[in-house]
Design a protein with these regions (language model features):
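Sec-dependent N-terminal signal peptides
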Residues: 6-11
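C-terminal segment of classical bacterial N-terminal signal peptides
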Residues: 14-22
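Long, charged/polar, soluble alpha-helical segments
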Residues: 24-227
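Positively charged n-region of N-terminal signal peptides that target proteins for export
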Residues: 1-4
Length: 227
């Protein structure tokens, strides 16, 4: 069973998660975390997959209200969650997440200094961050599907679908019309997998194929955004 060793800088309050800043992935038995750290199952982390998008949307509201310090704090929350996900990612997915973390941290600093005038800078950075998360969760789902773990596969597929969907909020142009149907199909299949209600192999395959194509289109659009 995989765990994340996490430095205790996180708190849960009012159903909102502040993500710890330092984390690294470990494969080890429970109880072996060093002093000042906790050992958290990866499954627990996935349950908070929606936190970055909440922070990003709150940051936009704060930015528009000229509450720059508050906006910067929300951007840092999102960046910290991406750093946490990067700790359990690998290969190119890890690099894309880390690149996004660095972009968000710089953006937060600039916002706090009132050095950002254009909302589009936030929107573009958030689109890249949500693409990085969507791709990461999708690749995790592919990995877990190959291992035959239906429930965990479903959770990761759900998170990937959510970020393919919510990431469109930040794009300067809408993705093509059929994306909602693909996302909804992936969500339906993922729910069946999570709750064990019997997702057929062919519908699982279609969900992965369809979402993978939408993810590629999302990535192509994000690649054209100005940094």
């Amino acid at each position: 069973m995989r765990y994340l060793v996490i430095c205790i800088t996180a708190v849960l309050a009012h159903m909102s998660l502040t993500i710890p800043y330092y984390a690294w992935a470990q494969t080890q038995p429970a109880g072996s975390a060093p002093s000042g750290y906790v050992l958290v199952e990866e499954d627990v982390i996935v349950t908070f997959a929606n936190e970055p998008k909440k922070s990003f949307r709150t940051a936009v509201g704060d930015f528009l209200n000229r509450q720059m310090r508050a906006a910067a704090a929300e951007i840092r929350k999102g960046a910290a969650y991406l750093k946490l996900e990067a700790a359990r990612a690998s290969g190119d997915a890890k690099k894309v997440l880390i690149d996004s973390v660095q972009e968000l941290e710089k953006l937060a600093n600039d916002v706090q200094k009132a050095a950002v005038a254009d909302l589009k800078e936030l929107q573009n950075a958030f689109a890249r961050a949500e693409y990085a998360l969507a791709r990461h969760h999708y690749l995790k789902a592919v990995e877990l599907r190959a291992k035959g773990d239906g429930q965990k596969t479903g959770r990761e597929l759900q998170a990937a679908a959510d970020y393919v969907d919510s990431g469109q909020v930040w794009l300067t142009q809408k993705m093509h019309e059929g994306v909602s149907d693909v996302v909804n199909e992936a969500r339906l299949v993922s729910a069946k997998m999570v709750y064990g209600s019997g997702a057929a192999a062919d519908e699982v395959g279609r969900a992965f194929e369809g979402l993978g194509k939408e993810l590629d289109k999302f990535g192509s659009t994000v690649g054209t955004l100005k940094k």
